[in-house]
């Protein structure tokens, strides 16, 4: 079945169904903005299940991950990178590192994940990409379901079982001042 141009698609798009032209335009704008915020973007073959890493100075993507997922991972890891190098956000990170209570940890983890998502949404808007809010929000919720299941069940769930659609749209937040420094490598899976 031939795919329709983006302007002919009616309704929301599901995660995994973004038209390539929109992805390429977004990619060009977002990669430029990530670099202008002081982060280097690299490609490297990562050990599965890792799909991307960040260390406060650069964001690494696995080239074997499909392009739509790379777009999301870059936005999301940009958000996490900002969290780790923005002095204003440092106090929030301690809750992730010192909780023995699983439910409390998951609550803080959700806050952390969605704050990164709000930062990613701000980056999208700052480069003039405002028509993909629902796509990004659905990807964020899908990612959260995936991460939460991993922490609850102890194994990586099938991505398809976590897919979400028509989720509440993520509200962007400001990108605070950054002080770039190397931090412990963290990864997406």
Feature-to-residue mapping (PLM):
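Active-site scaffold of zinc-dependent metalloenzymes
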Residues: 8-70, 78-85, 89-90
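Post-HEXXH active-site segment of zinc metalloproteases
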Residues: 84-118
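Anionic, Ser/Thr-rich low-complexity intrinsically disordered regions
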Residues: 50-53, 89-92, 107, 180-188
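Long, well-structured alpha-helical subdomains associated
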Residues: 66-69, 121-189
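N-terminal secretory targeting signals
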Residues: 1-3, 189
């Amino acid at each position: 079945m031939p795919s329709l141009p983006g302007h002919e698609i009616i309704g929301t798009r599901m995660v995994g169904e973004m038209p390539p032209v929109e992805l390429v335009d977004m990619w060009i704008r977002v990669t430029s903005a990530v670099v202008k915020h002081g982060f280097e973007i690299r490609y490297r073959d990562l050990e599965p299940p890792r799909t991307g890493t960040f260390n406060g100075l650069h964001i690494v993507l696995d080239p074997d991950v499909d392009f739509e997922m790379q777009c999301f991972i870059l936005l999301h890891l940009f958000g996490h990178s900002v969290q780790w190098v923005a002095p204003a956000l440092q106090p929030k990170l301690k809750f992730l590192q010192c909780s023995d209570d699983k439910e409390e940890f998951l609550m803080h983890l959700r806050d952390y994940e969605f704050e990164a998502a709000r930062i990613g949404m701000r980056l999208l808007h700052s480069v003039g990409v405002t028509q993909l809010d629902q796509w990004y929000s659905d990807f964020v919720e899908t990612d959260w379901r995936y991460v939460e299941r991993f922490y609850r069940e102890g194994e990586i769930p099938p991505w398809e079982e976590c897919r979400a659609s028509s989720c509440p749209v993520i509200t962007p937040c400001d990108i605070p001042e950054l002080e770039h420094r190397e931090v412990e490598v963290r990864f997406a899976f």
